[in-house]
Design a protein with these regions (language model features):
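Sec-dependent bacterial lipoprotein signal peptides
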Residues: 1-21
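Extracellular/mature segments of secreted proteins
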Residues: 2-3, 28-29, 93-98, 125-132
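Transition segment at domain starts
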Residues: 24-73, 155-158
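An anionic, turn-rich surface loop/hairpin at beta-sheet edges
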Residues: 64, 100-129
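Short edge beta-strand/loop segments characteristic of extracellular beta-sandwich folds
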Residues: 72, 81-87
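Noncatalytic modules at the cell exterior or secretory-pathway interfaces
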Residues: 77-83, 124-152
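Short, surface-exposed beta-strand/strand-loop-strand elements in extracellular ectodomains
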Residues: 90-109, 149-154
Length: 159
């Protein structure tokens, strides 16, 4: 073997190894935007208090503080649950921050984590049972690729 053929073989081997170690590909920014728009354009379900949509970056293992999207309600209501979805394959973790009015006039926030919500065409319903709700925040995180998430907040106001 000549030096040239050894060098070419080494370069080919390195290229092959590098190809096997690349990060998983995700949707393009245009695909993410189109998916987010389609979620916002869908017919609202009964009992919709609000919706939240956000982008997620790969390799962010911890939730943001404060939540990525926060919804506030002028009149305290009842929270029945959330419908969570995310773009692509894999899974995503969600933190849902529920802020309630306290009897003494202050507020209290509790964070509920929904881990490993599968991404794909089907949304996942998660039950929550809270009254006197004045705000809900949502954060999606711990993705293995860039993408997006969507959450529908379900319940009733004035309850």
């Amino acid at each position: 073997m000549t030096r040239t053929s050894v060098a070419r073989a080494a370069v080919a081997l390195l290229a092959l190894l590098a190809a096997g170690c690349t990060a998983p590909t995700g949707p393009t920014p245009d695909e993410v935007t189109a998916w987010m728009d389609s979620q916002d354009d869908a017919a609202p379900p009964a009992g919709l208090l609000g919706s939240a949509t956000g982008r997620v970056d790969a390799g962010v293992p911890e939730p943001s503080d404060p939540p990525q999207v926060s919804l506030g309600f002028e009149t305290a209501g009842r929270l029945d649950g959330v419908r969570l979805s995310c773009l692509g394959e894999g899974s995503l973790d969600f933190d849902v921050s529920v802020t309630t009015e306290e009897a003494a006039g202050g507020t209290r926030t509790q964070v509920v984590t929904f881990a490993d919500v599968p991404c794909g065409p089907d949304a996942r319903d998660e039950a929550l049972d809270a009254t006197a709700v004045v705000g809900v925040g949502v954060t999606g995180y711990d993705a293995d690729r860039a993408g997006a998430w969507h959450a529908l907040v379900l319940g009733a106001t004035g309850a």
